[in-house]
Amino acid sequence: MALKAIQRQEFNRDDILEFKNTLCLGERNDGLLKYFENEHTLKDSDYKMFVVAILKEENEDRLTILERIVATNENFSDKDLPKVQKISASLNRENAHAGEKIQSDEGVWSTK
């Protein structure tokens, strides 16, 4: 499952970058992505559905990979998933490009 998730992430990467660049996706503080309306999604319902579908896939893939990390690391148990998600969120914020939306650990949204 994790390999398929990584492959799908690679396939969707350009779309994710575009959506983050146009501010209809942002990096949440739990390692997942959040949807935001923008001018394009408000005017074009098909585009909005596409963004939401890709968002759903990306979040599923991220969770699959994080769950695999927890399952295969002897230092983690299932209850450590939220901690691993926070670590992932921190890395995602660090790797976000200037102008992208990011959420702090405290839940505050800002633009990097």
Positions of PLM-derived features:
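Short, well-ordered alpha-helical segments
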Residues: 54-70
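Amphipathic, charged alpha-helical segments and their helix-to-coil junctions
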Residues: 2-49, 53, 72-112
